[in-house]
Amino acid sequence: MLDREKGGYFGFEVSPDYQISQSYVPHTNILSTNFVSEENEFAVVDFMPCYHLSDASNCYRPAEIYRYIRRIKGTPRFKINYEPAPDYARGKTIFNTTSEYIETYSTSNSKDRQYLYSSLPLHNILEQKEIVLAKDEFLLLSYNEKVIPVNIEREKLEYCRTLVYWLNWTDRTKKFTVYNDIIERSLLVLKLMSFYNGAVLAAITTSLPETIGEVRNWDYRFCWLRDASMSIETLFQIGHVEAARRFMRFVQSTFVSQHDTYQIMYGIRGERKLTEVILGHLSGYKNSRPVRIGNDAYHQLQNDSFGYLMDLIYQYYRLMPGTLDEVEDMWEMVKSILTNVMIDWKKPDKGIWEIRGEGQHFVSSKVMCWVALDRGARIADLLNKPTYRRRWSEEATVIKENVMKNGWKEEMQSFSQTYGNSDLDASLLLMEPYGFIDPRDIRYHKTVQAIKNALLYKGLMYRYKSHDDFGLPSSAFTICTFWLIRALYVIGEKEEARSLFEEMLHNSNHLGLFSEDIDFETKEQLGNFPQAYSHLALVNTAILFSEEDIRLSFK
């Protein structure tokens, strides 16, 4: 994807007379690609093993993917194109073939090794010879050399166990009277982006451009506190308590109590140093340079981040208080976070959109600092800590007064992006869902209408239309359209909101997935894919127009 010449691939080549389609096995993250011609038919079923062991608290999730080739009709013919390019194609790929597997690694990093197992002759795969499918076959690509026999019986066992895992997982999800399939698919996406330790990725790709040919290409394979908190809160509200519990443990294990050690994002294993590197030897997706790995945003001050986290902490511990030691650990973390917020809310920051220029006083950042202190005061109230409750509540009041004074612009009849400009920003729509402003407040109504008039174009939303470090944004930001739909709904424009939501659903890909951005004209998916932001917002918006189907909650 990131270089058509140097990039790796692992695919099937068939004659032009085949029709190709894809779908998920219902209620799972198992993907089936179907190849159909007049005389022949076969399917490639892709899945990553995932299932509970005899100890239900542990899950088997190796770093590997099975490709089960199922013969359906006739004698299908195809070639397998297997050309891995490990370590971002920075070195030459070395192939080592044994009687069991094809091992590959890069001369630039020999520790990163892949092992391809198959029931098909390995030399036919390496030489890209035509294969005649007479029976079911399989491929297994693993990052580990297997220590038990790999055969088709093992593959079928892994498939069945994985199928049961996903069916059980979706069975624990709340069911809705309308849009249930759409909600379920988005939740399955969020689940796939959750690591076993509780961390949640913003997306699973790097450097897919926000606009073709431009430089807004970022590595999203990290855990932002903001994105992860929003994702986990969505999963939590839909019935997946364990996801929230794991994330809380991740946050508590990653954080320490010194103010100067907090970051707005971490590596998936809690890594703190996420140095950004440009891979100049790669041409980029559709020649959109640069290709980046790492993300220097980890240095940034983004004052809004702790608002989302504190909202989740409050919701979680209000409903799932946990053990005494867990609550005490949480309380120490809350005090440390809010010490941070009390100091930093007055400072300019980089904001939710992570500008790389000079920091500004973003209204949405101030609002989320209010959220952090408001939720902290509520937690203090739950724990009978009146001194902290009073201190944080008073500071939250100061922030709200500050925003109302400096963020509301009479000449615009709207809140503005920053204290120092008169631009509009879709993140202002978050003032209502987080409780900063009442949906009946005329200032919110006017802000929603102003944002819609300025930023909505062809059924899609800009984040903002002001110049930033890279010029003017030129693509739609998917989550912002969902934010607008909610805002219209809560101010009473429910029919308009529903119509816009239905239109938005047509912009997903053939599997119901959304990326970060969408091209206004062509509706092409742009940016990193799939995007947690987009799918959590889709779920939160869809349930506005539905209700829980309690008939399906009985077991």
Which ranges hold each PLM region?
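Acidic, mature catalytic/reactive cores of soluble proteins
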Residues: M1-K555
